[in-house]
Amino acid sequence: MAKKSMIAKQKRTPKFKVQEYTRCERCGRPHSVYRKFKLCRICFRELAYKGQIPGVKKASW
C-alpha cells in the first residue's frame, strides 16, 4: 500500500502537466498501472480472477 501522504500529493494538480503520473485507484501503487482500467498489475490480476472486471477472462490455448 502507498503512503497516505503520497496519495494526497498525487491528487494535487502539478505545476507542469508533464509531472502527472498514474496511480492504482485501488491500492495507490505508482508503477505498472494499466491506463484503461486504472489498476496496477497486481490488483488487475486479483479482480480478473474473481471475475469482477467485465470482458476479462483468463487466457487458455
UniProtKB/Swiss-Prot annotation:
Co-factor(s): Zn(2+)
Assembly: Part of the 30S ribosomal subunit. Contacts proteins S3 and S10.
Family: Belongs to the universal ribosomal protein uS14 family. Zinc-binding uS14 subfamily.
Gene3D superfamilies, per database record: 30s Ribosomal Protein S14, Chain N
Cellular component, GO annotation: small ribosomal subunit
Purpose of the protein: Binds 16S rRNA, required for the assembly of 30S particles and may also be responsible for determining the conformation of the 16S rRNA at the A site.
Cofactor detail note: Binds 1 zinc ion per subunit.
SUPFAM superfamilies: Glucocorticoid receptor-like (DNA-binding domain)
Binding positions (Zn(2+)): 24, 27, 40, 43
One annotated GO molecular function: rRNA binding
Any Pfam family: Ribosomal_S14
Protein keywords: Metal-binding, Ribonucleoprotein, Ribosomal protein, RNA-binding, rRNA-binding, Zinc
InterPro entries: Ribosomal_uS14, Ribosomal_uS14_bact, Ribosomal_uS14_CS, Ribosomal_uS14_sf
GO BP: translation
Protein name, per record: Small ribosomal subunit protein uS14
Family annotation (NCBIfam families): PRK08061.1
